[in-house]
Amino acid sequence: MRLWLVRHGETEANVAGLYSGHAPTPLTEKGIGQAKTLHTLLRHAPFDRVLCSELERARHTARLVLEGRDTPQHILPELNEMYFVDWEMRHHRDLTHEDAESYAAWCTDWQNAVPTNGEGFQAFTRRVERFISRLGAFSDCQNLLIVSHQGVLSLLIARLLAMPAASLWHFRVEQGCWSTIDICEGFATLKVLNSRAVWRPE
């Protein structure tokens, strides 16, 4: 099985530097262009199904990438970005004085501290691992397109490669790029990370 990883295009919150876990934030014109470029780069990729986050920025990206295809799509909450709740659509500069104690604790120990009323890293990790455990349900597929978010995709790569969850920072998944992981008999290999090349059949 090959997993094709695509991060949603640039959003207004990305440009403003805001935390945007589940909060709605539309693609910018640049983000729309990134998704349309991926449509061209991946035109010949033989996707059997697409697994997508519930969030509109990911779904919009998926629609643009797959324009003209009738690829079956599954919307999965496990692929949603980490949920910041009270910190949604806020800048870290504001949190340093508006929610100083919680934000300082999170900066000091991000693996165990929890954003105010939000989803902590441990819960987020368990959610992404639930998604990994569900991949077996798609064993009839050779090529799965996964459209999601930076945090999810970085953590997905780390855990599939049997690395600790905290290793996600080693894998920055860029917007406007595609990546692939091959899984054979339960062993995952990162084949491509952040390609901007046209995919051609091997």
Swiss-Prot record:
Known function: Catalyzes the conversion of adenosylcobalamin 5'-phosphate to adenosylcobalamin (vitamin B12); involved in the assembly of the nucleotide loop of cobalamin. Also catalyzes the hydrolysis of the phospho group from alpha-ribazole 5'-phosphate to form alpha-ribazole.
GO cellular component: cytoplasm
Sequence similarity: Belongs to the phosphoglycerate mutase family.
Domain of life: Bacteria
Record keywords, A-Z: Cobalamin biosynthesis, Hydrolase
Gene: cobC
Pfam (any one): His_Phos_1
Biological process, per Gene Ontology: cobalamin biosynthetic process
InterPro entries in alphabetical order: His_Pase_superF_clade-1, His_PPase_superfam, PG/BPGM_mutase_AS, PGM_Phosphatase, Ribazole_CobC
Pathway annotation: Nucleoside biosynthesis; alpha-ribazole biosynthesis; alpha-ribazole from 5,6-dimethylbenzimidazole: step 2/2
Active site: 8 (tele-phosphohistidine intermediate), 81 (proton donor/acceptor)
PANTHER family reported in the protein's UniProt record: ADENOSYLCOBALAMIN_ALPHA-RIBAZOLE PHOSPHATASE (PTHR48100:SF59), BROAD-SPECIFICITY PHOSPHATASE YOR283W-RELATED (PTHR48100)
Catalytic activity: adenosylcob(III)alamin 5'-phosphate + H2O = adenosylcob(III)alamin + phosphate; alpha-ribazole 5'-phosphate + H2O = alpha-ribazole + phosphate
Species assigned in the record: Salmonella typhi
Residue ranges crossing the lipid bilayer per the database entry: none
GO molecular function: alpha-ribazole phosphatase activity
UniProt-recorded name of the protein: Adenosylcobalamin/alpha-ribazole phosphatase
Xref: NCBIfam families: PRK15004.1 (NF011580), ribazole_cobC (TIGR03162)
E.C. designation(s): 3.1.3.73
SUPFAM superfamilies given in the database record: Phosphoglycerate mutase-like (SSF53254)
